[in-house]
């Protein structure tokens, strides 16, 4: 493998180049196709003005072109949707925030059904471990912005709609300006600060919010801030404790579960945009995939006491721009590394490799949950999950004792050190902090966890 | 009185990962009524096996937990003062944020 290092990096570079070129070409094709359609329409109008009206498309009051009539015919044939519904849809604009598990199916359906203008905002790039649920993306876009990938997919399904790309994170500084350009907002994000920020912004701008969430085997869906209904804060005035907020990347999710919720988000959005049916406002849909149960419950209406949408609210655009949502929810907008420990309590993955190679006496403690440990682990590591560390501290003590006893026989005099590892290097810091407080003065954390080990030491070590 | 209690959105992890509990709660005497406040303290004592702070804060549920009595938000029936009746279905659900 090492001897081919030069070749493979060359191949990777060329692949990247080709993929970029391919995306550019696809973009150019959809632009040209849209242009062609416009030209065709103009030519038809020219024919009308020349008096050949029996050879041209009839002028129709609803404004749908012959191509649109054909493309959307199955929706036009629905008596409850019909030409009015389609016409409203074509005039509407929708912003989908997040092109992940929820956003993927939502965007595919919204593009396909003919929402006139579709905005996509996300700061992230496509990763291999997204593919099982974020079905809008293809392998060719791994490493590229999710927005680019999602926009290309939407254009390839429907080249006649306008797709706006925002390759950036949504923040209080850009939210008002971006959201104000759309009729309906779809919250397909994955964290509490974003959810509060988006809801508050929708209240300020008077936009309906189609909000979905999914984790593990469960999903939830509702429409906020619609027709006098509640906003997110009416329902959840106080943020939950941080320990109750899990991300799919930490707790896992079955791909189809956000898929179901994302599809339902598209459905609620289509209903709002086309002004058809009864939106899921003041009601919430709860989906439990394992027991195959879907229940719709009645939730409270708008609260007159709500700090944002209530009667005496002083919340305005200025308050919004200055509001610290990460501080309010005690939760980061983006998953980033923790920095709990001083440098002397930490070592890098490369330094740990040397300890490994020199066969220095040590205990490697892996504090991940046991089902993570079963996926992959470093050799000779002891697994005590962080949650059980306090209760199972004696296991660490006896493991250390065993090493020390073994050591006496070899005549060495250094005490074995404790190195702590986890998946990304956050829990390992919490564990080291606890261990040092409990008298394990040699405890050190391996910076960046197993992900750093895979990135810097052993590229063949699986990450997940 | 018989009740069906359901836990979801991760709250089931606090009661041995069992989502649906059919329970029987006896009143002290016939004239007494049972409110949500009584039920919450019964649940905390009898069903919650770990991390009670993930279920309750003070004498009510922690922020981020929705309580539904017969598929209806307890805000609409009087929260802690909601009077319960035989065979009521009470759902405790933690709000999800993932996506």
UniProtKB/Swiss-Prot annotation, chain B:
Cross-link Glycyl lysine isopeptide (Gly-Lys) (interchain with K-? in acceptor proteins) per UniProt, renumbered positions: 99
Family membership: Belongs to the URM1 family.
Stated role: Acts as a sulfur carrier required for 2-thiolation of mcm(5)S(2)U at tRNA wobble positions of cytosolic tRNA(Lys), tRNA(Glu) and tRNA(Gln). Serves as sulfur donor in tRNA 2-thiolation reaction by being thiocarboxylated (-COSH) at its C-terminus by MOCS3. The sulfur is then transferred to tRNA to form 2-thiolation of mcm(5)S(2)U. Also acts as a ubiquitin-like protein (UBL) that is covalently conjugated via an isopeptide bond to lysine residues of target proteins.
Organism: Arabidopsis thaliana
Name by which UniProt lists this protein: Ubiquitin-related modifier 1 homolog 2
Annotated localization: Cytoplasm
Lineage: Eukaryota, Viridiplantae, Streptophyta, Embryophyta, Tracheophyta
GO biological-process terms attached to the record: protein urmylation; tRNA thio-modification; tRNA wobble uridine modification
PTM section of the record: C-terminal thiocarboxylation occurs in 2 steps, it is first acyl-adenylated (-COAMP) via the hesA/moeB/thiF part of the MOCS3 homolog, then thiocarboxylated (-COSH) via the rhodanese domain of the MOCS3 homolog.
Pathway this chain belongs to: tRNA modification; 5-methoxycarbonylmethyl-2-thiouridine-tRNA biosynthesis
GO CC annotations, alphabetized: cytosol
Alphabetically ordered keywords of this record: Cytoplasm, Isopeptide bond, tRNA processing, Ubl conjugation pathway
Superkingdom, natural source: Eukaryota
């Amino acid at each position: 493998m090492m001897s081919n290092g030069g070749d493979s990096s060359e191949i990777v570079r060329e692949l990247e180049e080709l993929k970029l070129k391919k995306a550019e070409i696809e973009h150019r094709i959809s632009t040209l196709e849209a242009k062609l359609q416009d030209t065709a329409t103009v030519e038809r109008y020219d024919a009308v003005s020349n008096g050949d009206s029996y050879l041209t498309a009839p002028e129709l009051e609803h404004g749908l072109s012959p191509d649109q009539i054909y493309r959307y015919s199955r929706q036009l044939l629905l008596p409850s949707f019909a030409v009015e519904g389609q016409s409203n849809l074509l005039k509407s604009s929708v912003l989908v925030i997040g092109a992940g598990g929820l956003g993927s199916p939502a965007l595919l359906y919204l593009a396909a059904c003919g929402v006139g203008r579709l905005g996509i905002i996300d700061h992230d790039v496509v990763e291999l471990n997204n593919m099982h649920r974020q079905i809008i993306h293809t392998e060719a876009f791994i490493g590229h912005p999710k927005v680019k990938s999602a926009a290309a997919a939407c254009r390839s399904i429907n080249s006649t709609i306008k797709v706006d790309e925002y390759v950036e994170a949504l923040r209080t500084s850009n939210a008002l300006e971006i959201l104000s350009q759309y009729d309906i907002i779809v919250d397909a994000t994955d964290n509490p600060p974003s959810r509060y920020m988006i809801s508050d912004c929708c209240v300020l701008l008077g936009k309906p919010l189609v909000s979905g969430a999914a984790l593990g085997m469960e999903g939830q869906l509702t429409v906020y801030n619609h027709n006098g209904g509640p906003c997110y804060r009416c329902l959840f005035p106080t943020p939950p404790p941080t320990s109750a907020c899990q991300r799919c990347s930490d707790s896992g999710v079955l791909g189809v579960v956000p898929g179901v919720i994302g599809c339902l988000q598209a459905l609620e959005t289509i209903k709002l945009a086309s002004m058809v049916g009864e939106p899921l406002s003041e009601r919430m849909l709860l989906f439990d995939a394992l027991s195959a149960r879907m229940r719709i419950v009645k939730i409270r209406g708008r609260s007159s006491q709500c700090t944002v949408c209530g009667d005496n609210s002083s919340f305005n655009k200025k308050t919004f721009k200055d509001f610290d949502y990460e501080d309010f929810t005690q939760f980061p907008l983006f998953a980033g590394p923790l920095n709990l420990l001083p440098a002397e309590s930490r070592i890098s993955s490369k330094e740990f490799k040397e300890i490994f190679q020199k066969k220095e006496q040590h205990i490697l403690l892996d504090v991940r949950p046991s089902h993570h440990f079963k996926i992959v682990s470093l050799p000779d590591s002891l697994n005590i999950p962080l949650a059980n560390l306090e209760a199972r501290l004696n296991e660490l003590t006896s493991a250390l004792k065993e090493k020390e006893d073994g050591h006496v026989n070899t005549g060495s005099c250094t005490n074995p050190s404790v190195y702590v590892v986890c998946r990304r290097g956050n829990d390992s810091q919490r564990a080291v902090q606890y261990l040092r407080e409990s008298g394990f003065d040699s405890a050190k954390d391996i910076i960046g966890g197993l992900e750093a080990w895979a990135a810097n030491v052993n590229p063949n070590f699986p990450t997940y | 009185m018989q009740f069906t209690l359901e836990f979801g959105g991760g709250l089931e992890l606090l009661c041995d990962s069992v989502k649906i509990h059919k329970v029987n709660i006896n009143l002290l005497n016939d004239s007494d009524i049972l409110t949500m406040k009584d039920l919450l303290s019964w649940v905390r004592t009898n069903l919650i096996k770990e991390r009670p702070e993930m279920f309750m804060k003070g004498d009510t549920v922690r922020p981020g937990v929705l309580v539904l009595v017969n598929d209806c938000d307890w805000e609409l029936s009087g929260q802690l003062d909601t009077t319960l009746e035989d065979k009521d279905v009470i759902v405790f659900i933690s709000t999800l944020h993932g996506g």
